[in-house]
């Protein structure tokens, strides 16, 4: 089963308040988007002007206002400030309310969101965070069967736990990966795979996509059944100066992976990001005022095997972006699929 090309909208919870974020997702459906995903942050990456509405409340509100959008997190960490059993219950409920439209995008987590909510001790190294992710996914899937679940893991346990309302179609789990280790796990166990753009094409062609295929092969799975999602960071505007300047709010994306995973305070994150020159900030983004040029840059990811393109626009005028995307980019992109 070959996955079809899908175009999605990234709802920037770090940038917009809850009501505006809901209305933008409703507008995204009207402009033909196939999905809308939202980040799950307790704290934003930017203290001044930042936002952090609760992802699951947003998903439910958007679900009530839309008819066909696939809705999900990109991504949620079901392992520290959350109990994975409760997350399983929440997603099961949404799956019953909006059948076939809900997905859970899951990752290993960042200190920014977990330390503030009570995690004590030294922030865990990758090995523990990865182990927690795998264990939480297994527990949630056990609970989604609707059967009584006695689970005894290294980090989580349940005794006689049942989720009484589970959707017949299940809840697909998308695994977010920035390197081959977790990408292999996505291939073994994920219904979908999530990565982000702007890190050099070699990462996708030589590491991530081969790792997904390797994991699927070892698990005797058909890799074409896995929805391969990428958040494409794109600043498209017919005004080239606006296209460049719009990236500034998202300067934290240009910090190193180590900085993003270890910084605990949005004020500290903002200070580190604002010290970066605009040229460095813009490197993470496709910055373009020409639709053919923008599509040519996006096409690299399609050619690498990614089929679900979720577009993250950095500017504050998201309505303008959605209008321009619908007019200039979507027809060209769908012609590629």
UniProtKB/Swiss-Prot annotation:
GO biological process terms on file: carbohydrate metabolic process
Pfam families: Bac_luciferase
Catalytic activity: oxidized coenzyme F420-(gamma-L-Glu)(n) + D-glucose 6-phosphate + H(+) = 6-phospho-D-glucono-1,5-lactone + reduced coenzyme F420-(gamma-L-Glu)(n)
Active site, per annotation: 41, 110
SUPFAM superfamilies (UniProt xref): Bacterial luciferase-like
Highest taxon of source: Bacteria
Positions that bind coenzyme F420-(gamma-Glu)n: 40, 77, 108-109, 113, 178-179, 181-182
EC numbers for this chain: 1.1.98.2
GO molecular function term, any single one: glucose-6-phosphate dehydrogenase (coenzyme F420) activity
Signal peptide range: none
Annotated substrate binding sites: 196, 199, 260, 284
Record keywords: Carbohydrate metabolism, Oxidoreductase, Plasmid
Subunit structure: Homodimer.
Family per similarity comment: Belongs to the F420-dependent glucose-6-phosphate dehydrogenase family.
Function, in words: Catalyzes the coenzyme F420-dependent oxidation of glucose 6-phosphate (G6P) to 6-phosphogluconolactone.
Protein name: F420-dependent glucose-6-phosphate dehydrogenase 2
Lineage, broadest ranks: Bacteria, Bacillati, Actinomycetota, Actinomycetes, Mycobacteriales
